[in-house]
Amino acid sequence: MFRDGSLIPYLTAGDPSAKATLRFLLAIEEYSGAIELGIPFSDPIADGKTIQQSHFRALKGGFKLEHAFNIVREFRKHSDVPIVLMTYYNPVFRVGLREFIGKAKDSGVDGMLIVDLPVMHASEFLEVAREEGIKTVFLAAPNTPDERLKEIDKASTGFVYLISLYGTTGARDKIPETAFNLLKRAKRICKNKVAVGFGVSKREHVEMLLNAGANGVVVGSALINIIAEHGENAEEKLREKVRELAGL
């Protein structure tokens, strides 16, 4: 789904506006192996404070689900960089799983991650995603047992996304040892590519994780902080940061 050594930026759709999100995506796409696009939700419990605030800004600005699909549709006119929708189950449930995935596919989405859908309850999601040709991505955390990691790998058709513990996402000064321990286990167990998202904020972090075996590195909070500070005018700062993190 992405080439080895990729940077995978995360942005929240609609923060601070749908038009701005499209501009931001186009500003960073040339340095991105894939892009995660978050669907705002009113109770984003699995995210840290930075990304939670991003969800709230988007919702306060009038975000509607259709805006996300329109953003991807417009993005597809200019770029073929893979887009992975990152969402909670509630927005999917409100629309209906089949309709949500169908709309995602029609707009040009490549993959989908439902943050709070455990792999053991994902059979319908897997079936519909397979029918629609949408890649599936599942999360694994440091406390995920090996047997569960095998199940996650088997269910994932895009990549396995290794994260810090729920609610602790955020830019850090150093990558915690738990990241490297989980990555080591995942490389032993998983047949899929693995992407790691552990508070990456510097190129040094990206290099450390890639050298430790990650196929891709996700960066979210460091970019969302830029949007929080610069709002509609974050485009150039985002481009510079993503280029720096990608080592280009």
UniProtKB/Swiss-Prot annotation:
InterPro entries, A to Z: Aldolase_TIM, RibuloseP-bd_barrel, Trp_synthase_alpha_AS, Trp_synthase_suA
Record-level GO cellular component terms: cytosol
One Pfam family hit: Trp_syntA
Gene3D superfamilies noted in UniProt: Aldolase class I (3.20.20.70)
Coiled-coil portions: none
Pathway info: Amino-acid biosynthesis; L-tryptophan biosynthesis; L-tryptophan from chorismate: step 5/5
Superkingdom assignment: Archaea
Active site positions, chain numbering: 36 (proton acceptor), 47 (proton acceptor)
UniProt entry tagged with the keyword Lyase: yes
EC number: 4.2.1.20
Keywords, comma-separated and alphabetical: Amino-acid biosynthesis, Aromatic amino acid biosynthesis, Lyase, Tryptophan biosynthesis
Listed CDD domains: Tryptophan_synthase_alpha
Swiss-Prot/TrEMBL catalytic activity: (1S,2R)-1-C-(indol-3-yl)glycerol 3-phosphate + L-serine = D-glyceraldehyde 3-phosphate + L-tryptophan + H2O
GO MF annotation list: tryptophan synthase activity
Family: Belongs to the TrpA family.
NCBIfam families reported in the protein's UniProt record: trpA (TIGR00262)
Self-association and partners: Tetramer of two alpha and two beta chains.
Functional note: The alpha subunit is responsible for the aldol cleavage of indoleglycerol phosphate to indole and glyceraldehyde 3-phosphate.
HAMAP family, per database record: Trp_synth_alpha
Protein name (Swiss-Prot/TrEMBL): Tryptophan synthase alpha chain
Gene behind this protein: trpA
